Amino acid sequence: MEKLFIFKIGGKMLDHAEELEAFLKGFSSIQGRKILVHGGGIFADDLAKKLDIPITMHEGRRITSAPMRDLVTMVYGGLLNKQVVARLQALGCDAIGLSGADGAVLKAKRRKPEPIDYGLVGDIFEVRRDLLETFINHGMTPVLAPLSWEASGEILNSNADGVACKITEAFSGLYETYLFYCFDKPGVLLDVENPASLLAQLDRPAYESLKKQQLVKDGMLPKLDSCFRARTLGAHKVLLSTPTNSLKFAAGADYVGTLIH
């Protein structure tokens, strides 16, 4: 079965031009089929502060008001997405930038307001694999912003980790899917200040235990929830690590990071 590499990168990397450039060079050199999903929460927060738009989070998930939804649409679907696509094109990677509204590629329903009202947040229930597959078959690399589309015509904010998970799920019956969550740590750490506390592997019971001890919390919760969901739904490999280590693993090296079981 042919391999498909799905990378998710976050706002911290997007906020550091040199790190982003190094990653995009490595990503563009990957042979074969690949998809890139990006976040951008740091950019969104910075702009929200300048515009006096309140920022509200719950357990690492953004509560999205109408003004915040408009802001993330501009930031994620506009500036950040097109900057990444422009750099990939310059590096010889034929990329196409998409939000979930483009071709209704990420179909979602607004999350129910109980027990927490997350506002204009979409839970993705369908990925248009046929559309993404068309681009991939033409040698193009889809670059997706974490915005989804509701049938009413509403644009909804969706968690980028969840977007990567749903895309992996959609393709897992067609390809041997490799999902990489790239961030600024080498993986899941028992002590965030000590890289030597890296967990090389993590299964569901161990994760639940870490949650109870509050050794993982905040933004790591939705990330790890997405990791286990992707693994359950057919992902061949799911790795949390740095961009450099993730790229090396995609190129055939032994993994360094946290492999999800």
Across the structure, where does each feature detected by a protein language model lie?
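C-terminal catalytic "cap/lid" subdomain
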Residues: 1-261
